[in-house]
Amino acid sequence: YDSCPELIEKLKGMGIIVIADIDDYWLPTKEHPIHQLIMQNKLHEKIVKNLKAASYVMTTTEIFANEIRKFNKNVVVFPNAIDPNESQFKEPTLPSDKIRVGWLGGSSHLHDLKLIDGTISKLSPLQDKLQYYVCGFDTRGTVTEINKQTGEKTQRPIKPEETVWLKYEKIFTNDYKIITPKYKEFLEKFEDKEYFGSENENYVRVWTKPVNSYAKNYSKFDISLAPIQDHVFNRMKSQLKVIEAGFYKKALIASNVGPYTIDLKHALNQGQFTDGNALLVDNARNHSDWAKNIKKLVENPNMIVDLGERLYETVKDKYDLNQVTKTRSEFYKSLIK
């Protein structure tokens, strides 16, 4: 990192165009697992120096591009995109008597998911009609322990019961109140196995999948949730959750924040459905509207299908990898004319 800006200047001096590509803000908030690591090594400062030195910077949204332009005016936007012919985006959704609500993500989203804590409890009267999915469950990782006498730091693999995914699971199961004791006993074994009868449970744990097949998990549910806290790191994120849900024709309930404001239009006006393509939750309404929006869709299941179709129409051409790659290729060609 330290020598990168100097190297970039040397390359530019030789007539070589240097392009930096970035899709995450350089300084995550304090609750993020890697915040301390970045601060200790001043990685955020080094990233900004590289962005300043680059001939061009590529990123995924105009929101993030405007932030980068504070350091480098030559910023171009190429959004995240999907190959619609890739098998992981063609998995069929099987029918169910229940309306399935799902979340799919990684291990750094505890504070985002806290926005919906209490939602499952509020939906208790509708529980016989609902089933929840958490996709990406993982017990891998390490924990750093510090010897109080010597200050020595040692790393060890986390124990299964230490995984942050258990905290996710407690949010989606109302602290395991909505599942049977027998199923809870199975979950506590932390075995990546099918549970016979899981289709009858109110919650399903879905283990992590490789990057080339994780999106198949969208086929498991009908309504996709995308809660994010309103802070600079999240505002600079891409709208990938919108794109993925759209290609799978899922009804989406999302935070009315940053990347989700790019393509989404709220589909409710004074309790009546309008021409929007998703349901958005304002910051001031996090305490109530996640449950209200799910309830609205449970009571109007035809809107689950309609919103999924509308979102698909929004994303299917704009975020088709073939089109985005063509545009990117044209940009590269323009640099060497």
Go through the PLM ranges and name each one.
Residues 296, 303-318, 327-330:
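A short, well-ordered alpha-helix in the C-terminal region of glycosyltransferases
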Residues 207-246, 253-266:
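Nucleotide-sugar-dependent
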Residues 83-89, 94-219:
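Conserved catalytic-core segment of nucleotide-activated headgroup transferases in glycan assembly
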Residues 1-14, 113-115, 244:
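An aromatic- and histidine-rich active-site surface loop
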Residues 13, 37-56:
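Membrane-proximal helix-turn-helix segments that form the acceptor-binding/catalytic region
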Residues 11-29:
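Active-site proximal beta-strand in glycosyltransferases
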Residues 52-90:
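Donor nucleotide-sugar binding/catalytic pocket of nucleotide-sugar-dependent glycosyltransferases
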